[in-house]
């Protein structure tokens, strides 16, 4: 794979993660401030895999 392809893949992944995090916060599941046990990564995983971020 070319370095350019890998670069675009990383950019796309970053954009996806940030949009997911924004959606998570918008739903009232504030991953950064309100819930110390629910950082952004955990929030995305729990919300999509377990159906809850609590």
UniProtKB/Swiss-Prot annotation:
Give the signal sequence positions.
Answer: 1-21
Task: Spell out how it gets used.
Answer: Potential candidate for insect pest control through ingestion. Feeding leaves coated with this peptide to neonate D.saccharalis result in increased mortality and significantly reduced feeding compared to caterpillars fed untreated leaves.
Name the major location: secreted
Location of the protein in the cell:
Secreted
- Keyword Secreted among UniProt keywords: yes
Q: Which UniProt keywords apply?
A: Disulfide bond, Knottin, Secreted, Signal
Q: What is this protein's tissue specificity according to the annotation?
A: Expressed by the venom duct.
Q: Provide a GO CC annotation, any one.
A: extracellular region
Q: Which cysteines are joined by disulfide bonds?
A: 24-39, 31-43, 38-53
Q: What else is known?
A: Highly abundant in venom.
Role of this protein: This endoparasitoid wasp peptide has a role in disruption of the cellular host immune response, since it reduces the capacity of D.saccharalis hemocytes to encapsulate foreign bodies. On the other hand, it shows no effect on the humoral immune response, since it has no effect on phenoloxidase activity.
UniProt domain comment: The presence of a 'disulfide through disulfide knot' structurally defines this protein as a knottin.
Name this protein carries in UniProt = H-bracotoxin-Cf4
